């Protein structure tokens, strides 16, 4: 009988009696011959409802522009915070677009093929969600020409560029809102916003604002998207940057725009400019109503995957100070293998395969604490979560700095500067795991397919902390196993459910043994392994 062993420390006595799997969950393989969504390097979609084919093959990297890198070629204001000082809510560090361009080799070495940028337009905030001008690059980030240079450099390396679109609200400094502040009822733009009376009070907190704002924050006046002029303006912004050459839009709080047909029109108009444009919505909860029929978004930021994966890999190591006051960010309580299986099954059942392939999967972001801090500094949790992220269907997204073990609590601490000058403090284990897993994803089409067959745990998992899944695509077949528990686990799956003739351990440590009637999997505590099987 063939036996494949990893680290010799994983040798165990197979005379033990592991539980046998009686339940296997299978998600039907997507057929590239009948559905073009899965074809690599395919041409642009011919139907408005098609998802861009490049997304399922992409590995994203999220950049918060003020904190990633800064170039000496961009003139800066004097009053900047020190790069390595703790971030504050309102302070600027001075990161810029040419700084990103000068570090593209780093991203290429990681295997990154797409960048999602937090907002880059003129704004009065370091995060730039307070938009002043949707048609100009923020001067601290550089010039419009700097953006063109960055875009060209990314495309030369095969890296796609996705921008953050904030279309639900603008800012107090947005020209048309400022005109309303100056001219009141006589402003030609009074209908662009939800005005409840005059005078407007954008700063006097002891007076009613007299206008609607996002979450009541006066700095963020909400657009009246029922107004034809305002709506056409926002559509034009989407078209303009699509015409400038971007590859996608990440849409901020899109579910808060209630105007009927708004996002359908946005998709139609922007995809008319670039038929291969990726449109992904920031929706924290289950988002099938926004993505399933392909009339609005290609996919969603997949926070249900985030929270399930953290609950499984981090478990009771979770730092309570990193918890968010968000009912959809349910990283606690901890779950075992069965709990993780249930949440992943629920997630995959809620989306058709094209949407699953276009979802943006992540572990952390500018809106959450960083995963290393969530896990109270436990690097095992990060490595296990990366293994699940980079073998899951859809596009994985790595938040800048996660690959070197950058930590940080809730906003603003999760927006620390990238520690370029402190390489000695980088977490080399996390960095190597990130590089190796990204490379493995690029090498194996199976890891980018929708064929996701859960082999373990069964329905009666009885507290098992192991999770095993088969990933397959034509002749490419892999077994991915994670043991999130504190003890070694040995589990058996019947040969009828999972059989192989040869297996090669390509990442991690573990032992895989094929018997006459069963396949035995053995993993040490807090470990993961990936095999290529035939």
Identify the function of each model-found stretch:
Residues 1-64, 68-70, 75-114, 148, ...:
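Carbohydrate-interacting/catalytic domains
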Residues 64-67, 121, 138-141, 167, ...:
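Short, flexible loop/turn elements at secondary-structure junctions
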Residues 59-61, 115-117, 161-163, 249, ...:
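Hydrophobic faces of well-ordered beta-strands that scaffold small-molecule active sites
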Residues 49-60, 64-113, 120-244, 266-272, ...:
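Substrate-binding/active-site clefts of carbohydrate-active enzymes
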Residues 151-160, 168-169, 174-185, 236, ...:
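Active-site-proximal helices and loops of the catalytic beta/alpha 8
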Residues 63, 107, 117, 134, ...:
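Conserved, mostly hydrophobic/aromatic
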Residues 234-257, 361:
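Active-site groove signature of glycoside hydrolases
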Residues 354-376:
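Active-site clefts of carbohydrate-active enzymes
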């Amino acid at each position: 009988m063939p036996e494949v062993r990893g680290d010799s420390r994983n040798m165990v006595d197979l005379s033990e009696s592991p539980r046998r799997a009686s339940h296997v969950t299978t998600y039907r393989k997507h057929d590239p011959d009948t559905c073009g969504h899965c074809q690599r390097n395919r041409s642009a979609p011919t139907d408005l409802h098609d998802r861009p084919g490049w997304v399922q093959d992409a590995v994203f990297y999220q950049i918060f522009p003020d904190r990633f890198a800064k170039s000496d070629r961009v003139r800066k204001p004097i009053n900047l915070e020190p790069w390595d000082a703790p971030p504050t809510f309102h302070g600027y560090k001075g990161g810029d677009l040419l700084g990103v361009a000068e570090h593209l080799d780093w991203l290429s070495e990681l295997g990154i093929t797409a960048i999602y940028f937090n907002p880059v337009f003129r704004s009065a905030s370091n995060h730039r969600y307070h938009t002043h001008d949707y048609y100009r690059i923020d001067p601290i980030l550089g010039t419009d020409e700097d953006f063109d240079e960055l875009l060209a450099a990314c495309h030369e390396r095969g890296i796609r560029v996705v921008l953050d679109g904030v279309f639900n609200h603008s800012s107090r400094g947005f020209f048309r809102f400022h005109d309303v502040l100056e001219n009141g009822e006589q402003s030609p733009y009074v209908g662009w916003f939800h005005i409840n009376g005059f005078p407007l009070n954008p700063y006097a907190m002891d007076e009613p604002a007299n206008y609607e704002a996002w979450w009541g924050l006066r700095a963020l006046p909400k657009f009246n998207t029922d107004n034809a002029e305002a709506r056409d303006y926002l559509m034009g912004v989407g078209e303009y940057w699509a015409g400038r050459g971007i590859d996608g839009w990440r849409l901020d709080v899109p579910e808060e725009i209630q105007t009927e047909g708004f996002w359908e029109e946005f998709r139609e108009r922007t995809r008319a400019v670039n038929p291969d444009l990726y449109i992904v919505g920031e929706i924290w909860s289950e988002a099938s109503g926004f993505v399933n029929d392909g009339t609005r978004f290609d996919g969603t930021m997949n926070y249900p995957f985030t929270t399930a994966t953290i609950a499984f890999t981090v478990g009771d190591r979770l730092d309570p100070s990193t918890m968010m006051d968000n009912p959809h960010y349910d990283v606690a309580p901890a779950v075992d293998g069965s709990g993780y299986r249930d949440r992943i099954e629920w997630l995959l059942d809620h989306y058709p395969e094209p949407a699953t392939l276009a979802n943006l999967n992540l572990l952390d972001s500018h809106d959450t604490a960083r995963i290393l801090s969530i896990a109270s500094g436990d690097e095992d949790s990060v490595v296990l979560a990366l293994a699940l992220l980079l073998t899951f269907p859809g596009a994985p997204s790595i938040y800048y700095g996660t690959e070197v073990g950058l930590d940080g609590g809730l906003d603003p601490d999760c927006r620390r500067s990238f520690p370029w000058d402190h390489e000695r403090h980088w977490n080399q284990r996390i960095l190597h795991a990130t590089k190796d897993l990204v490379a493995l994803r690029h090498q194996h089409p199976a890891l980018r397919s929708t064929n996701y067959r859960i082999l373990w745990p069964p329905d009666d998992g009885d507290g098992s902390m192991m999770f095993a899944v088969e990933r397959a695509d034509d002749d490419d077949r892999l077994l991915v196993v994670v043991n999130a528990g504190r003890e070694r686990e040995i589990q058996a799956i019947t040969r009828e459910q999972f059989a192989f003739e040869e297996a090669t351990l390509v990442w991690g440590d573990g032992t895989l043994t094929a018997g006459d009637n069963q396949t035995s999997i053995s993993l040490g505590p807090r470990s993961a392994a990936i095999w290529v099987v035939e």
